Amino acid sequence: MPAIHGLNKTTLLDYPGRVAATIFLGSCNFRCPFCQNSSLVLHPADEPVIPEEEVLSFLKKRRGILDGVCISGGEPTLASDLEDFICEIHALGYPVKLDTNGTRPDVLKHLAERGLIQKAAVDIKACPDNYPSLTGMMHPDLTAIQETVSFLLHGNLDYEFRTTVVKELHNENDFIQIGQWLKGAKAYYLQAYRDSDEVLQPGFSSYSLEELEHFRKILLTTIPLVEIRGID
């Protein structure tokens, strides 16, 4: 079963419209400088592991209080036995939302076609041209990410796209290009960056609400629902 490195026992944010628990798995194939979970990305083997039985027991006891489970990371589609783990969660009656960077479309498609995930949230790091600098990878697999985007745009799985917006890394042109790339998407969220010691490269800053609202208006020309998250 996948190594579980974190459990947020109650969240109203991670699975919109549901009272959910979020499970964090380790490892990632990106090295985004603004990543909020650097320890899970860089040194997952050094992080404490929560036994699967403990997590499933918690979920069993919380039935009737929780009504959803979010699986995040890291990049959860890299985890071994992810499918079996989700089957265990489904057996308890929970719908599952999967957070992903979109680099493993075959895993996403398989889980969706088996009815094992009810929603996907895909992190759009930047416009395609800027993926190398914002993912820390010289040659990120943009073909795979495009396959994920196309699958969601033209499929039946509920989804959202989202971008953590960093002042030093994103600008107006990014969102003009992203708006064209994701044209017709059902939902897109601009997430305000928050600096912390857990960030892979701390020291970045966030745009103001007014600046994020400007990006939102750009995106609304091609995407019908665009909202801002993370502003107090």
Which ranges hold each PLM region?
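Conserved AdoMet/S-adenosylmethionine-binding subsite of the radical SAM
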Residues: L56-G68, T77-L209
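Conserved beta-strand termini and adjacent loop/short-helix elements that scaffold enzyme active sites
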Residues: L7, Q191-Y193, I228-I231
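Conserved alpha-helical substructure of the radical SAM core
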Residues: S38-V69
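Short, charged low-complexity linear segments at domain edges
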Residues: M1-R18
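SEC14/CRAL-TRIO lipid-binding/transfer domains and related phosphoinositide-recognition modules
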Residues: A3-N8, S27, V41, E53-E54
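Canonical Radical SAM [4Fe-4S] cluster-binding loop centered on the CxxxCxxC motif
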Residues: Y15-I50
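A C-terminal junction/extension of Radical SAM enzymes
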Residues: E213-D232
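A secondary-structure boundary/capping signal
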Residues: F24, S72-G74
